[in-house]
Amino acid sequence: MVAVASSSSAASAPRSGEEIREAFLNFYAERGHKRMASASLIPDDPTVLLTIAGMLPFKPVFLGQQERPAPRATSSQKCIRTNDIENVGRTARHHTFFEMLGNFSFGDYFKQRAIEWAWELSTGVYGIDPKNLVVSVFREDDEAELIWRDVVGVNPKRIIRMDEADNFWASGPTGPCGPCSEIYYDFKPELGDEDIDLEDDDRFIEFYNLVFMQYNRDAEGTLTPLANRNIDTGMGLERMAQILQKVPNNYETDLIFPLIQAAADLAGVDYHQLNDKGKTSLKVIGDHSRAVTQLICDGVTASNLGRGYILRRLLRRVVRHGRLLGIDKPFLVTMGEAAIALLKGAHPSVIERQEVILAELQREEARFLETLERGEKLLAEVLASKPTQISGAQAFELYDTYGFPLELTQEIAEEQGLAVDLDGFEAAMEEQRQRAKAAAVSIDLTLQDAIDQVVADQAATCFEGYEALDHASCVQALVVNGGPSTTAKAGDAVQVVLDTTPFYGEGGGQVGDRGVLAGSDLIVRIESVSRSRDVFVHAGRVERGELALGDTVKAQVDRACRRRAQANHTATHLLQAALKQVVDPGIGQAGSLVDFDRLRFDFHCPTAVTPDQLQQVETLINGWINEAHALQVQEMAIDQAKAAGAVAMFGEKYADVVRVVDVPGVSMELCGGTHVTNTAEIGLFKIVAESGVAAGIRRIEAVAGPAVLAYLNERDVVVKQLGDRFKAQPAEIVDRVAALQEELKATGKALAAAQAELAVAKAGALAAKAEAVGDFQLLVERLDGVDGAGLQGAAQSLADQLGDGAAVVIGGLPDPGDMGKVILVAAFGQQVIAAKLQAGKFIGGIAKQCGGGGGGRPNLAQAGGRDGAALPGALDAAQAELTSAFRAL
């Protein structure tokens, strides 16, 4: 029999989340398991967006695609799941971010030892009374039941057989699979052992799952025993914390509740005094704050695609639930700081990445608050009409016009007991797609259709361009002037398919080669090369002679162009390596362009790269160039390449055998492009621009090799022209421009002051025109040729002269010759404000008559418009509206 808990072991059992995690890892480390660090939430697996299970990092090992790290391993793996996000905060145990404790055997121990250790850990280390435990087994797994009953000593009534849907694990329709056994905690053992229903979530919680991988399933569904059987287990850290800390749900454990308390403090509420709706919002904030912090830490940035969209959705849910609690100011950074403080012990990388995490939280919250304010206003108008549902058209308007996520509309509607017409939403989305198609510029698809037609019948082109730039090739297909053909003559635009080619076809960000196809009295100038289904299509024009199907031609790549493309491509690899070293190791490629004269690299990064960092990157790259690193290019299995540390672009599909381009000690990437043989061939590298191209995506543009000299020569010309213009030496230009800017600034201030004085002087004569309306002094006048600051000064001066009952409105054209710009200002005294009239609201409404708007403080405000012809009518309206308001008082 396996040892069970005693009262003393229960008293000394781990309690905190940190202790529970460490106890698990130590228990298995003492039993020969290698402690493995948590893998990133961004998995090295193109089939999933995020790490969703503790076994995912070991999946290649279980599938026989990768060498095992050790016969036995144990880990605490960070995981994210969002498939049931709507249940977060509403149930006791649903989360987006969670930690999965696991022990793994790769062809080492199997079922009996896994069961014995799981029981020993649960009862002996964690001190759980066996009376509180129930186990499940697969309905056909007699072996597991016997071990639980006869070896461990579990009461047979507390061993429950389950169907395949619950207790049989498979990696997919085919492949390794096997039965599993789960351990449940019973919160109500006093109810006895009869008619146990493990689906009763109020009574039972599953906390430890043991998977026995012992079969291989083929396409026919036949199960064959595996030669090497494996163990894959998972224990939910948050669930065990709930059990040992004796709290009603996972959220009230020390792993999450500090974040709930932080949110409650921000909202000024007491968690324990809130209703269920309020508690749910706090739980969502607590859960999601952990998730977004870990996602950003591992390199995810908010976007509208893939895992970036998951991050954005979680962030926006946090903000919205904060608003439901009355938090009307930005607070994500505060929650991020609280999450970092909570997570840093087990996950020190959050401290290393703190600046990046907080910057992304701040940026995305600011972006969403604008969206939320617009969308909530429109949605409130919709709900005010008390509809039976939110129509598809309304949901689409929120999405399309205001950037309001459909999921958020669904959540808000659900809170009001309403549904969203999803079919109508999809119909509106499809209508927009069709409108976009109809409005788009018509594209002549005849050429592409012709190319597709000839390519469909061709075998893959044999590419010889890594080793040779000249090759004798046979013409396999021709497209001439937009249609399939057997011949092409001088002057014809032509697309040529060859059996073998030295020309690189556009791909991987690199442009296709240029060159010629030559023969006896034949020249075909090739301007670009593309690929379609591994068939290379050479596009160009026949300059001399005639080309026919079956001809043998000499395919010659333009060597100068190829050299420049090679230099730029290798420089792009060096750029990514330098960015990882200088800016952030988590930087990942989002796209690239390798042209003959320039290169462009897009990468995931939440903030702009600073000028100092750009200088460091540039210096580092030129240092690697000067060090003359010889490149090593080889083909190897994809798993071997990744194990060696080769960088792959996420989302890119790779073959089983890949090409690895290695700059030893600097960079190693999977790449099918062409490269220099030594970094010294690049010559020079120069960054010319850094910018943002999308949310969380930065772009660096650069030149390399001879293009650097051309770039510097252009800059020299500009510097010389500036020097001549400002009569200054190159080193003096910056100071000279700065001095001129200061002079201009001072002149501008003096001019503004003079204009303000002039406006006040002009206004002085207007005070006598004020009209007494009851206890108020009303003055509405036009004053052209004065800017906004001048009009404000004049209005305020007049209001001061007229006293507390003053209401002054002045409108004018700052440039009397420009009818497209109107300025309106209002200045109200305290007596007017006390009568519930505010300058900001009033002048904003008047400005609408001039096609504009604006506002400001209750006592002084400015608005603008675009229709000067409407100004007289707007001033008349102001006079009438204020007169009526004053007489009504």
Swiss-Prot record:
Location(s) in or outside the cell: Cytoplasm
Catalytic function, reaction form: tRNA(Ala) + L-alanine + ATP = L-alanyl-tRNA(Ala) + AMP + diphosphate
Residues that bind Zn(2+): 569, 573, 671, 675
Keyword line: Aminoacyl-tRNA synthetase, ATP-binding, Cytoplasm, Ligase, Metal-binding, Nucleotide-binding, Protein biosynthesis, RNA-binding, tRNA-binding, Zinc
Sequence similarity: Belongs to the class-II aminoacyl-tRNA synthetase family.
Native source organism of the sequence: Synechococcus sp. (strain CC9605)
Cofactor: Zn(2+)
Cofactor: how bound: Binds 1 zinc ion per subunit.
Name of the gene encoding the protein in the UniProt record: alaS
GO annotations of cellular component type: cytosol
Annotated GO MF terms: alanine-tRNA ligase activity; aminoacyl-tRNA deacylase activity; ATP binding; tRNA binding; zinc ion binding
Pfam families per the UniProt record, alphabetical: DHHA1 (PF02272), tRNA-synt_2c (PF01411), tRNA_SAD (PF07973)
Keyword presence, Phosphoprotein: no
Top-level taxon of origin: Bacteria
Name of the protein this chain belongs to: Alanine--tRNA ligase
GO BP terms in the entry: alanyl-tRNA aminoacylation
